[in-house]
Amino acid sequence: MLSRRSLLIASALAASAPTVMAQNIAAASESLTPVGKKVDLSKLPRRKVKLVAPPMVHPHTQVATHEPSVVQFEMTILEQEMEIDDNGTMLQGMTFDGSIPGPMMIVHEGDYVELMLINPPQNTMPHNIDFHAATGGLGGGALTLVSPGEHTVLRFKATRPGTFVYHCAPGGPMIPWHVVSGMSGAIMILPRDGLRDDKGKSVKHDKVFYIGENDFYIPRDANGDFIRYTDPGSAYGDTLEVMNGLIPTHVVFNGRVGSMTGENALQAAVGETVLLIHAQANRDTRPHLIGGHGDLVWETGKFNNPPLRDQETWFIRGGSAGCALYTFRQPGVYAYVNHNLIEAVNLGATAHIKVSGTWDNDLMEQVVAPSEYGDAHTSGKALP
């Protein structure tokens, strides 16, 4: 007799059967067997870390203060309806730990990442996780496919320092559908001696702001209104049709329009150095800090490569996470945007950073306040 797990996996694979990716995942899952000597990590210290919701990150040291260890995380997959704008538009979301993006994990190079991934029984479909930071097994995707009511534990060694995307990848068209339904996040693997600038000098940050950019594809009815569905499965067919048009209805930071604007703005102070981590699992994007810059930018997010200096706008390739370091020099509200301004202004890809402190007139000063254009110009008088 077929088990519930078998039926769920069969359904997912049947939907994705036409694609090579699904065939590869199925083949990998069937053919993987233990290879080589089992690794004994019993003498390594183990640390349990509680994940926190974006845009914050869990406490961490910037320079490793310990020998390599096994860092234990736990994430629960939640399928849930989520409001994605102030107009009441609803997404049948699929999430890691209930947030879009999923929480940031931070370890040091040489550590082992050990993740318990839980798929609760109230969910409706299989899920897994593909770490772009991991080596082998489709990033862990081939080893972590769990049906509702199951859990699994994956461990991999953090060998490459940088910021990396993770996402769900259950096979075929399920992959992009799960990703654009919210199932992506990021992990940061810090060098053991911390971050360094392009000249090799150690640099530190006071805060981390973690921004996950998502493109959503919400179907409309005959009147042009967004459709609200009862569960992810009922949304699948219509959503896939919109997805295949490659035109998102929403492009947002951290799960919804306005998630980090107005009263929800991020907070900083003049003199503080902030590490801005930006992840996009699906589409290219162009972060820009209006009123500021990227002092140091790891555009591809990989810390073995020297950072760029003094960037106005940087490029995050779809399927990657990059980061920028900036020290705020003026108070005020900064807009952090995707500089495809249509997506920033019309579709939602904007965040605000409110910075407190004292204004520096040497950096910028309003010489003449807005006034009627007249005598000061036509008389040829010099400006003060």
What are these regions (language model features)?
Residues 2-384:
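Copper-binding active sites and cupredoxin-like electron-transfer domains
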